[in-house]
């Protein structure tokens, strides 16, 4: 597919974004970290050749999806950290946002680990420098601000990061456990809301300083 073909309108408007969102939907609904190009084409209504046109290959599509999802997270965290608000309120809002993120993209951590593992060193460092390091620094500041103001116990920000993200990732990537132990494999908004409230209460109880 040539550039002239694109200019002539052979490529539907918004096709790149539609391919990414359809891939996201397929992985979320199937609780998987892979897609078939035939299903992607069927679900999106687009020619699978557009994957090569926009992303080079399926691996490029998966990398672009990770970039889309992780860039959105970093931007949201940066915006939250820029707000003038008390550390406790900021952390409560962040924990809720983490739960919402993994409800929307339960494949995220598995996709991240897969791409880091399968990438060469340069690409793995790019992923870390672009997304993981900024998030780590945000957690450092988030916890340090609360400790300095006497609101939070002096916990390790690195371990707190894994506690918070791990709680959300584990729950929303455990559909088989929900199915076989609790007779449900549907991630409903009601379930998300219940788990969000649970995580906020549970995690905040562990970090708030005794008053």
Show the residue positions of the predicted features.
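Short amphipathic alpha-helical elements of helix-turn-helix/winged-helix folds
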Residues: 22-26, 167
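Helix-turn-helix
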Residues: 18, 26-60, 64
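Generic hydrophobic, amphipathic alpha-helix propensity
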Residues: 15-23, 40, 65-69, 73, ...
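C-terminal peripheral helix-coil segments that are non-catalytic and often amphipathic
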Residues: 2-4, 104, 133-149, 153, ...
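Amphipathic alpha-helical linker/stalk segments
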Residues: 3-6, 65-93, 142-144
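Short coil/turn segments at alpha/beta junctions that flank glycine-rich nucleotide-binding fingerprints
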Residues: 29-33, 84, 105, 149
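Short secondary-structure transition hinges
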Residues: 100-138, 159, 185-190
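Hydrophobic alpha-helical connector segments
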Residues: 78-110, 157-164, 193-196
């Amino acid at each position: 597919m040539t550039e002239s073909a694109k200019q002539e309108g052979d490529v539907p408007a918004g096709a790149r974004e539609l391919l990414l969102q359809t891939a996201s939907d397929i992985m979320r609904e199937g609780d998987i970290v892979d897609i078939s190009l035939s299903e992607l084409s069927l679900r999106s209504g687009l020619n699978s050749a557009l994957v090569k046109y926009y992303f080079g290959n399926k691996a490029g599509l998966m990398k672009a999806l990770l970039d889309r999802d992780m860039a959105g997270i970093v931007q949201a965290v940066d915006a939250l950290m820029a707000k003038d608000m008390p550390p406790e309120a900021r952390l409560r809002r962040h924990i809720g946002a983490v739960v919402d993120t993994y409800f929307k993209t339960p494949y995220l951590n598995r996709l991240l680990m897969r791409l880091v593992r399968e990438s060469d060193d340069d690409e793995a460092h790019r992923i870390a420098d672009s997304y993981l390091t900024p998030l780590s620094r945000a957690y450092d500041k988030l916890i340090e601000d609360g400790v300095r103001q006497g609101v939070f116990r002096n916990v390790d920000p690195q371990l707190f990061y894994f506690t918070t993200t791990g709680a959300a990732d584990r729950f929303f990537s455990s559909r088989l456990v929900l199915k076989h132990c609790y007779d449900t494999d549907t991630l409903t908004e009601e379930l998300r809301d219940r788990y969000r409230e649970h995580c906020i209460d549970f995690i905040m109880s562990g970090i708030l300083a005794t008053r």
